[in-house]
Regions:
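Conserved C-terminal alpha-helix-loop-beta "cap" of PLP-dependent enzymes
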Residues: 83-137
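Structural detector of well-ordered beta-strand residues that form the stable sheet scaffold
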Residues: 10, 73, 107-109
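Conserved PLP-dependent catalytic core of the aminotransferase class-I/II
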Residues: 43-92, 96-101
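Glycine-rich beta-alpha junction loops
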Residues: 15-18, 39, 60, 88-90, ...
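Predominant activation on well-ordered alpha-helical scaffold segments within soluble catalytic domains
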Residues: 29-40, 61, 99, 120-123, ...
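Conserved core segment of the aminotransferase class I/II
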Residues: 1-47
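PLP-dependent enzyme catalytic core of the Aspartate aminotransferase-like
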Residues: 121-160
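Generic structural signal for well-ordered, non-membrane alpha-helical segments
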Residues: 24, 28-32, 46-57, 95, ...
């Protein structure tokens, strides 16, 4: 162990002396170059993508606000643009059934990403534990179109 009590690093792959014996085999230069180029593009487009997602977020939130019975779990300006959590206040609405029915069109989720497959501590902290089956999380990205947003809004309207 080192001075901090951390055990020494062991080899990831055995058989060669590349990377000071920590990794065997020739490095995949094409993957390294591809990753570097992807990072370069991501950095180059960061501001434009951020602006686009903020614009799409406003379109989605505006559309959702026109649907009676649907509310944002966090309408605050402090929420991250592009991640929209809503509660559908319809008696027989079940988020998992709804997601399954539209999974060929949209990728939605229940609750928070921090607790996939379990009751979300975020939803509980917001005081929504009794409505956990009515929460949907909508995530937008640079590939989301306004047409898709309007389609989802129309599907949500038809659900209520």
């Amino acid at each position: 162990n080192d001075a901090y009590g951390i055990p020494p690093i062991t080899a990831f792959m055995h058989g060669g002396e590349q990377e000071n014996g920590f990794r065997a085999g020739t490095l995949a230069v094409h993957n390294i170059v591809g990753f570097g180029k992807a990072a370069e593009i991501a950095i180059r487009d960061l501001k434009a993508n951020e602006q686009r997602i903020m614009q799409l977020d406003q379109v989605m939130v505006s559309g959702i606000s026109t649907i009676p019975g649907i509310s944002l779990t966090n309408p605050s300006e402090k929420r991250l643009p592009g991640i929209i959590s809503i509660v559908v206040d319809k008696k027989d609405f079940n988020n998992e059934r709804f997601i399954k029915n539209i999974s060929d069109k949209f990728a939605l989720s229940t609750g928070s990403a921090c607790s996939a497959g379990e009751p979300s501590y975020v939803i509980t902290a917001l005081g929504l534990e009794d409505r956990v089956s009515k929460v949907l999380r909508i995530s937008l990205n640079k590939y989301t179109t306004e047409e898709e947003i309007h389609q989802l809004i129309n599907i949500l309207k038809s659900e209520l």
